[in-house]
Amino acid sequence: MTAPQTPSSNFLWFLPTHGDGHYLGTSNGGRDVNFGYLRQIAQAADQLGYFGVLLPTGRSCEDSWVVASAVAPWTERLRYLVAVRPGLQSPSVAARMTATLDRLIGGRLLVNVVTGGDPVENKGDGVFLSHDERYEVTREFLNVYSDLLSGKTVNVAGKHITIEDGRLLFPPVQSPRPPLYFGGSSDAGIDVAADTVDKYLTWGEPPAQVAEKVNRVRAVAEQRGRKLSFGIRLHVIVRETNEAAWAAADDLIRYVTDDTIAAAQKVFARMDSVGQQRMSELHGGRRDKLEISPNLWAGVGLVRGGAGTALVGDPQTVAARIKEYQDVGIDTFILSGYPHLEEAYRFAELVFPLVKPQHAGNVTPLRANTGPFGETIANEHLPNAKQAVKP
């Protein structure tokens, strides 16, 4: 397959603060995720030319703000997509945290707005609101939060949030504020997105479904006089051949049992997130029909919440599938793979030359006598570049 010409997009990687390993659904091949390992991934993503990294949020994860503030000084260009949590935070406190971190890391902060879609976890955090009430809180939160970051004094008495003489004394580096990313597939979520955020995110659904969602969100935003950009969250399993990539996908779930799938799907079923419901419907908890669209594999979603699909294939095939998403309006790809350190290298080395992200071109390669030609032969000869396997 010939790699298509692709418009430039942003590609972000992922810091696995909830765990990492070679396989899903088992401790076999598991890996300690400590500060040193997270720093390794961040530095690799920085040097490889990724635009940024997403840090997950929730009780199964290390706190994203603490991790970002610890890791960011070890990188130079990498941006950090960190979550604010309406309903769990005061918008004024969140604004101070945002401005402080943005200043400390030189304007490299991106903000992920997470409303929360698991009622059980929400109650554990003290939030007892219904689905639509949480989006009411999100709207009020973002209005106050954005105004504070933009330098305004805020006085508001809303249904859920009341602020008197709210001010931010020390502004962020980015003006008027760091970009806001947000995902919400329900009517309430789309309504909030159209009014308040900069980039709308979707899970990795088939291109036709993504196109439908993008068109719907774009139309609602245009009715409000606003224009949004769009991103997608996906896993990637890329190898030098399609056969090797599909073998790697099968191997990723080699230890996943039917009991493990049933237990995971039971947890997902209790959630009131429309996006999670759409993810679960793609595979129905069955492992016999996991290729839900050409080269889009739903095996991850058998046991993992949130992002449950992966692009699987050789570099040219994966680049072609990325182009399909670009053609329907996606300009940002938030990616991950298991294990995250190795797969960050694999995707960048195999696919970046085909998709040519602008941000990767800003990286000055480190000079080393072992690259990029590979290991010397017999301590004397350099490998012939013409014989090298080309991505």
From Swiss-Prot:
**NCBIfam families tied to this protein:** alk_sulf_monoox (TIGR03565), PRK00719.1 (NF001939)
EC top class, in one word?
oxidoreductase
- Catalysed reaction per UniProt? an alkanesulfonate + FMNH2 + O2 = an aldehyde + FMN + sulfite + H2O + 2 H(+)
For whether the record's keyword set contains rRNA processing, the answer is no
Function, as annotated, reads:
Catalyzes the desulfonation of aliphatic sulfonates.
Q: What is this protein called?
A: Alkanesulfonate monooxygenase
Protein family per UniProt = Belongs to the SsuD family.
A single Gene Ontology biological process assigned to it is: alkanesulfonate catabolic process
Give the InterPro entries listed for this entry.
Alkanesulphonate_mOase_FMN-dep, Luciferase-like_dom, Luciferase-like_sf, SsuD_RutA_monooxygenase
Gene3D superfamilies recorded: Luciferase-like domain
A family per Pfam: Bac_luciferase
Q: Which UniProt keywords apply?
A: Flavoprotein, FMN, Monooxygenase, Oxidoreductase
From the UniProt record, which GO molecular function terms apply? alkanesulfonate monooxygenase activity
